[in-house]
Amino acid sequence: MATDACIAAIRAAAPTRQFTPDELVSITEEVQRQVREQMALGKTPRAAKATVATAMQAEAKAAAARAKWSAYNDILKMADREAENRPAYAMLSDTGGGTTRNYATSVENSHKALLGDLLYRQQAELKAAKVDKRVLSRDPVWENKLAAELDRREDPTRGPSTGDKSAEDAARILGKTLDASRAMQNRQGAFIGKVEGYMPQAWDMWKARGDGSEAAYAKWKEIFGKNRDKDFAGLLPQQIEAKLRGQWQAIKSGVFGSIGDAGGHYDLGARVSQSRTINFNTAADWVAANRAYGIGGIADAVSAHADRAARNTAVMEMFGNKPKQLFDALREKKMNAAHALNTEAGNKIGDALKASRNSSLFGDVTGIHDIPGDHRISTINANVRALSQMIHLGSILAGGQALIHIPLNAMAHRLTGGSFLEGMATQLRGVFGKDQDMAHAVHAGSDALLQSTIRRFHSDDGSVGQRMAGFVNSFYKATGFSGFMDNQKGALGVALTHYLGRAAGKTFDQLDPRWQTSLTRYGIEAPEWDVARAFAQKASDGRMHVIPADIADAGVARKFQNYVTGHVAQGANEPTAWARNVVVGGTRAGTPAGEIARYLTQFKSFAVTMMQRQFGSLLRGGVDVPGIMLLASSAMGMGFIGGQLHGLLTNQHQNMPTDAEGWVKLLTDSAVRGGVFGLLGDAMLRDGMRSGSDVAKQLVGPVGEPLVDLIGALNNVRQGPGEGSRTTRGQEAIEGVHKVLGDITPNFWATSAVYNYLFPYMVANTLHPGAVQRHQEVMRKNNQSWYIPPSP
């Protein structure tokens, strides 16, 4: 069948469809491949073409039906979004306060809730089957068996049984996650069919890219170009080569299996429905490829697959099958409507919608900005910043800085049916991590499960290598911070569902007004409340609960799960996509501007988030004066306690002030440590980073701190000791080296305590006479004393 004739036939079959040249070539090649396949089975050319034509006609009808449904769905989505009284960009990520005070539904929150639905259920089933530790061990020998069972889970004829029940159970559970991921996307407009022997497609773009050369492609092709009979059946050699090169390009660019180019007006439902599967002949072939170019073990691949599915679903749920097109159209309509008001407020809204940052935020939320400009630059710098986390945050728990999360979570209780004091008591008990099974039932309390610990301290970084990410997460486990945060989030999540169950006998209008506002922001009003409260029952902790997963109405269940997920994120002060976007100015990783922004603003997303989430909630519907006083006073109190714990590590404590100046200094220091002014990120850093004399360090960010100290030391050595000074150039150099080493040494709580109690002053005084006395004078001015004075 001539190519021109085939193209003409395609156009005749779909006269209203405007095909791109690439689509026409792709369809033509597929038709020709299928004809050759039929001929290889013994059919005449005419019979082969007739068979393929019949199949293509059926597929065309199905595609037309899908397109019609998609168009109708997009119309409904646009109507829904137009009816909402908030700017288009606010639907991407809850911006807290201002024009979005009555809404909290967002792509970002839905993404997180959907991912929780998949992974918490999976974790519970793996644990019940007693294979959770086996799966997470990533043992190569056992994973071979797991892959084989995953490959044959629906068709036992695909290979022999391994005879390993644990592998069979794990494959069944992980397979359910893959099936659920496909189903949730199909419900929103995708049409993803089952693929025989489907294995998760989670390829590492950095490994595939290598140095981007032909040699890197040849190395990749050595594995992916063989043992794929089904993928290559009926294709000519040049077509196989074109397919392989296209897949390599898609994988190394990060587009393969992803949401795609968020800058284009593509049909997302159709895009995720397209075949983006690399089928190997056997599970062993897939395992070999995954070990060479995958993101980790099988559990990692399944989690990455679930994450993409959750994000795709959240985007389509909010913006339909053509999300960027609908978003742009909606933004333009709302912008014009705002300007048409001819008021100052309207003009501000219109200008905000017009800002290019909104397109950047769309890229952040949909994931396209996870793909950096230059992967090598991005990866190197992201790993440096990850190392900076360990240098600066090793004592985040023992040093008391993490305690601020207790009152922040307690404030969330106050908005959701509890009281602040009840919240403080709950969160203090939660430090010890009780009711973790209940926490998982309500999808709360496992940063490690959702692999989100490392992202808490990044402006955006998704470029951290797998090995470094694992190392940093292990580091936070060692510090106790991961466990502390999981326990805090779990305690809040369980309390939220308990408050729902406790109030099940009340009607919606009988609830506290603040609580009604919190529920309404997630689309929960009297009808949804009446549906949900009918499912109140005693849970394993002996108290009444309304657990979202138990609610029979799927739509209502989703709203309540979003409500729980959103408030847990608020209590944890997790940076939103909006906050991260603001902090880095909408720049992209791997670009000069993007990397500079990320270095200068590392940890600063906490400051923005504090103002957005915490104070934003207190300005919603009017100024909540009692709430502001509670938040400020409790944060200051935790800042004071944190300062005392920090003193234990640094071998110096704060004396009680004896004058007004001392009290002002103590209260100010406690307020800054507690993040009262939204400076939570700075409060996590060392004292020097908060002092007014170290403005240069504040400007360059924590990674630049050693450079500032090094420059200062070199300058001191160059200038030499001042007049009347007893120091020498050599001693100035030693002091400078000591300072720089302190900047780059991880302040893990145990080593920090040993260092501060046993080492520095004795050595410093030997090398630099008078160092202890001078430091003691500084401490006296700051009203501080040593716990254990150093030897003179």
What are these regions (language model features)?
Residues F603, L707, V737:
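Hydrophobic, well-ordered secondary-structure elements that form the walls
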Residues T282, W286-A398, A402-T668:
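Hydrophobic, often aromatic-rich secondary-structure segments at membrane interfaces
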Residues Q719-P792:
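Hydrophobic alpha-helical segments
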Residues T100, L421-D437, R729-I744:
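Short, mixed-charge aromatic SLiMs
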